[in-house]
Amino acid sequence: MVSTTLATITIMSTLVGYTTGPLTDYMWLLIVGFIIAFVLAFSVGANDVANSFGTAVGSGVVTLRQACILASIFETLGSVLLGAKVSETIRKGIIDVTMYKDIEHVLMAGSVSAMFGSAVWQLAASFLKLPISGTHCIVGATIGFSLVAKGQQGVKWLELLRIVASWFLSPLLSGVMSAVLFYFVRMFILQKKDPVPNGLRALPFFYAVTMGINLFSIMFTGAPMLGFDKLPWWGVLLISIGFGIITALIVWFAVCPRLKKKIECEVKSSSPSESPLMEKRELHEAHSPILKPVPEESSVLSSSTPTTPPLPPPEERRVTFDIGDSDDADQKDCKESDLGGAPKTAHVHFTNGPAHIPSNGYSQYHTVHKDSGLYKDLLHKLHLAKVGDCMGEGGDRPIRRNNSYTSYTMAIIGMHGDFKPKESEFRASEDGDKEKAGAQERKRIRMDSYTSYCNAVAENGTPEDLGEGEVTLEMVDEDAGSSRSSLEEDRTDADKPEVSMLFQFLQILTACFGSFAHGGNDVSNAIGPLVALWLVYESGSVISSAPTPIWLLLYGGVGICVGLWVWGRRVIQTMGRDLTPITPSSGFSIELASAVTVVVASNIGLPVSTTHCKVGSVVAVGWLRSRKAVDWRLFRNIFMAWFVTVPISGLISAAIMALFNYVIL
């Protein structure tokens, strides 16, 4: 990052070396501005790019590395081809720059202050894994420095009111549209016994709408580089509709037949079931024994004398999950417990009665499958606990909720033995009494998630078949009766593999389009003030009709990509996993509906934010899929971050501008 910035500054210095003018003495402001602009672009990449690929990563359609590669390509292309138009709006649309005539150096200092304030708050939000609007950041920072430099004169307060309105309009409109779209997808495709025929029939329509909406969004920006600024709105509309129809025909005659054959081949190669493709993993695992003897255990059993009386079976065994506050607070909570403190925890108790104690000498450790109803039921209870993730009665071993889908262990039914956390590993013992000398330690044998789920169900029956004295799940301060209804409600949430094959490329396509449009729109958040700084320095006047230099847009695009690779995973994790589980079908509904909302609302004059639209869609679809799967506490934190974005970025910018105005300049 430092080398790229220094190289750009060197080139810039060479270009302006022959320029002489009244602002030559303020070249240091230009250099500082380039450095801060790159940091700002870095923060935009770390935070805002999650809007495009967060749901795609969360649904498993692409890996994080693949998302970073695709986003780097399309963000850079979008910033170069589309960024010039939007940079003009950021440069001239918030304040009246004519007020700074004859005091151009004050506007230069203000641009540096605005970039600094926006960068600091976006980096802080990225650290906290909170998606915020980069546009609102730079607008708040611009207003902040203007209030210090010129007071309320020249500030366009109507723009600020539009921003406040967008906090509520954006998530509401996009959420409603996403929920409606997903409702029809679920009704006519997902809930059918065989979803493939209806899915194939709907595929051309989905592709046509996706291509048409995204093409219209890109062309309507009027990018000068591509000549779109010369097209009338009706011309853009006709081109978009025509391109969508052509796409639908290609998909119907070329893509659908090939996809149908591919699905049929997958179905034929697997045993018949409700979800045939899922059985392939079972068939592969059936060739290898899952439970193997443990050498240490065998030696202990062989050395034991037959005269040793067997220990009486315990009447009840209980494992308690102490659930802490958040991933970042795990270590803090555990330290507090070590120091004798009492961190705030809630307890999830799993009680296993003696009816199912294994007699074959094995203790089984089951990993919960990410798409099982039991996993989602536990996920719901952890969310409602509103506290974090420490496991074990003493907080010995923290569970990371967001590390992977296998972090909620020991929640599966069929849990055997008494579990005691150790420093190096967890072992299962025959009895929970630590003082009894004859207790034998048994190693837990890890199973793959889907196989362990099937084995547990085969051994113990479905959760409905188990009595209260055998396996129960209860939670302090929560109605235990909600477990059964939540489990039944969430069983049909996961997409069948056939459905995933239908929607996965659609979701990748919408994510790429979104990344391209995002590069054109949000590069202005990083480069808009820098463009103003550069043009003022080069021309010596605040009134400049010069076009935005392409190399400045490329500079911002590179900074965005660096931020994405270094720190982008944090907010991607929030958008794709933490708020609610995402599937390919729900991810596609989120992407398409939020894109439609942005295009329609922007063109009828309603203030919307891409970030707010995407978060609203994620929450609405997650709530529709499962009433209890949305982390409402996290959504509350995100909304509070939206609320303080403009004031905080404005205050930071105002403080830096005051330093410039009263101390440095």
UniProtKB/Swiss-Prot annotation:
Keywords: Membrane, Phosphate transport, Symport, Transmembrane, Transmembrane helix, Transport. It comes from Danio rerio (Zebrafish). One of its GO terms (biological process) is phosphate ion transmembrane transport. It is a multi-pass membrane protein. This is Sodium-dependent phosphate transporter 1-B. Belongs to the inorganic phosphate transporter (PiT) (TC 2.A.20) family. It is found in: Membrane. The lineage of its organism: Eukaryota, Metazoa, Chordata, Craniata, Vertebrata. GO terms for cellular component: membrane. It holds the Pfam family PHO4. Residues 294-345, 423-442 are annotated as: Disordered.
